[in-house]
């Protein structure tokens, strides 16, 4: 998998699929989710709440990825990835498992290009470097060879931090 790091607004980086942050209640309440709600209106929020209602649940388990429409955003669909628990805790392993679930779902949807913010780093406890550590080993997974992942960060400082973490994790993973 080719991993690109870009500074900007994740909602403006066109890709086949956006893997977005999500909380267990699938509420579009802040950060990237709040930006989705502002850009698209209540349609996606209603779709996510309908999903919960149809499942007979009020929240999804940690690691769940739920697909929705993308509205007027430059994606074929949005994959809402829950990489935090109800207390907003997370780990490198949980982020990696959640990203893998999202990438698998994206591939099944026929995606070749995927964009994502750094999951569990806003309201969640993870650092940008932790996210890099979680994602780096996936670059060498054969099942992801045909896709590219663009990780979108908000600053040049975060881009540098993420690049260093991914580079360091790749070196230690090869040992």
Sequence positions of predicted segments:
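Glycine-/small-residue-enriched capping loops at alpha/beta junctions
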Residues: 1-108
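Phosphate/ribose-phosphate-bearing ligand recognition and processing surfaces
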Residues: 84-175
């Amino acid at each position: 998998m080719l991993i690109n790091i870009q500074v900007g607004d994740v909602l403006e980086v066109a890709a086949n699929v956006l893997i977005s942050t999500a909380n267990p209640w699938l509420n579009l309440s802040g950060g990237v989710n709040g930006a989705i709600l502002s850009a698209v209106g209540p349609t996606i929020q209603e779709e996510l709440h309908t999903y919960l209602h149809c499942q007979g649940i009020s929240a999804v388990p940690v690691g769940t990825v739920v697909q929705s429409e993308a509205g007027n955003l430059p994606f074929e669909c949005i994959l809402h990835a829950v990489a935090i628990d109800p207390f907003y805790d997370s780990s490198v392993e949980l982020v990696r498992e959640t990203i893998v679930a999202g990438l698998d779902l994206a591939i099944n949807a026929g995606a070749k290009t995927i964009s994502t913010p750094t999951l569990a780093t806003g309201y969640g406890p993870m650092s940008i470097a932790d996210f890099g550590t979680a994602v780096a080993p996936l670059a060498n997974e054969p099942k992801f060879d045909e896709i590219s992942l663009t990780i979108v960060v908000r600053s040049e400082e975060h881009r540098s931090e993420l690049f260093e973490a991914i580079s360091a994790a790749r070196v230690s993973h090869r040992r």
